[in-house]
A protein has these predicted regions:
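Beta-strand/loop nucleic-acid-binding surfaces
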Residues: 45-60
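Acidic low-complexity intrinsically disordered regions
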Residues: 1-46, 63, 71
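P-loop NTP-binding catalytic core
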Residues: 74-143
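P-loop NTPase catalytic core
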Residues: 141, 149-150, 159-390
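Short, acidic/hydrophobic/Gly-rich beta-strand patch recurrent on exposed beta strands
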Residues: 34-39, 51, 85, 187
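Phosphate-interacting basic helix/loop segments used at nucleotide- and nucleic-acid interfaces
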Residues: 15-22, 124-128, 213-218
């Protein structure tokens, strides 16, 4: 549909320039207009990205991050293409989309829909997460990771489990300031959309992509879709925002500006599930024990903001105990809303038993016992039978 004030381009010989199909994700400019960026091109800025006029954005109440499909017309005098008609916004007609509630108008509730990650007997990582740190739709999860504790492998295993068990979820991975070879590895192993601003990109790229990807996920959740976002890492994202805001005159310890973490914390806080339908699950990594006071302060600022925390341990990794999860420090808030009663009772008994051990011994025992069973269901049945005999 074309607003009446947007007349089509006319070629030099007076003939109208033909319309072509086009689509992309809307990135807004502070002056009110926008451009359609290509997800297949990592949302990079290209001269061929269609221009969306401000009056069209206002008319259809378009928000940053929406997927727009319509008709595009090539501009004259070396101008880029312009959107002339809008056919669909997030799979809806423009009129339907204009009536949808915004992200902040929807009602957030506690996660209640358990996302099972167990696939087969191996890997044990996802089976242990199901027992000790269960994830639900709308979870705000933080993976706390010292260097070389298996963070990358854990993220890959989680992404593969989500793709296998929950194909209805829209899986997105955001990589900020990561090594280029790791970006390539993730793109080859993750069966979802991988958006990356690698360490050879500038700070502005890190900040721009972080905000655009979150807005994209919010728009999908508004439209009733269930989105699963893996973010690696929230620490490097916060570092980028610290450089981006500059020096406002007030600096915390470690060289972090007082306002630098406002936006990253707001982005992480967008994870939620809506009563009306739709959800955004965020699993983000936080780096610790890097020798940087800034990283430690960033972790302390984010600690407690999630409703699930999984802590990786260097001592376990050094002994090659995988997954290197510190059981005593890891858990999910309100897990009783996710787990069925039998599983919850078994998990409580398991935690009581393991809590009396050193955390290294506890994980060694758990992995050894769990590997004997083909599924968590069999393992839980054994715990339940031993409880009945007692």
């Amino acid at each position: 549909m074309r607003p009446p004030d947007l007349e089509p381009e006319v070629s030099e010989n007076g003939e109208p320039v033909p319309l072509e199909p086009g689509e992309g994700v809307l990135e807004m400019h502070p002056n009110g207009y926008g451009f359609l960026r290509s997800p297949a091109n990592n949302y990079s800025r290209e001269r061929t990205d269609p221009f969306v006029p401000a009056q069209m954005i206002d008319r259809f109440r378009l928000r940053e991050g929406v997927l727009v499909k319509g008709k595009v017309q090539q501009g004259r005098r070396q101008q880029g293409p312009r959107v002339r008609e809008i056919d669909e916004v997030e799979g809806m007609s423009p009129e339907q989309y204009a009536e949808t509630k915004t992200f902040d108008q929807l009602t957030p509730i506690n996660p209640e829909d358990w996302l099972r990650l167990e696939t087969e007997q191996q890997p044990l990582t996802t089976r242990i997460m199901d027992l000790l740190t269960p994830l639900g739709k709308g979870q705000r999860a933080l993976i706390v990771a010292p260097p070389r504790t298996g963070k990358t492998v854990l993220l890959q295993q989680v992404s593969q489990a989500v793709s296998t068990n929950h194909p209805e979820l829209s899986l997105v991975m955001l990589l900020v300031d990561e090594r280029p070879e790791e970006v390539t590895d993730m793109r080859r192993s993750v069966q979802g959309e991988v958006v990356a601003s690698s360490l050879d990109c500038d700070v502005e790229s890190h900040v721009r992509l972080s905000q655009l990807v979150i807005e994209r996920c919010k728009r999908m959740a508004e439209a009733g879709k269930d989105v699963f976002l893996l973010m690696d890492s929230i620490t490097r994202m916060a570092r980028a925002f610290n450089k981006w805001v500059g020096n406002t005159g007030r600096t915390m310890s470690g060289g972090v500006d007082i306002k630098a973490l406002d936006i990253p914390k707001k982005l992480f806080a967008t994870a939620r599930v809506f009563e009306e339908g739709g959800s955004l699950t965020i699993v983000a990594t936080a780096l610790i024990d890097t020798g940087s006071r800034m990283d430690e302060l960033i972790f302390q600022e984010f600690k407690g903001t999630g409703n699930m925390e999984l802590v990786l341990d260097r001592k376990l990794a050094d002994r090659r105990v995988w997954p290197a999860i510190d059981i005593s420090q890891s858990g999910t808030r309100r897990e009783e809303k996710l787990l069925d009663p039998d599983t919850l009772h078994a998990v409580n008994m398991l935690r009581r038993t393991l809590s009396s051990m050193h955390h290294v011994d506890a994980m060694e025992q758990l992995t050894k016992q769990l590997a004997k069973f083909k599924s968590n269901r069999e393992f839980i049945a054994l715990i339940a039978s031993s409880r009945a005999n007692d």
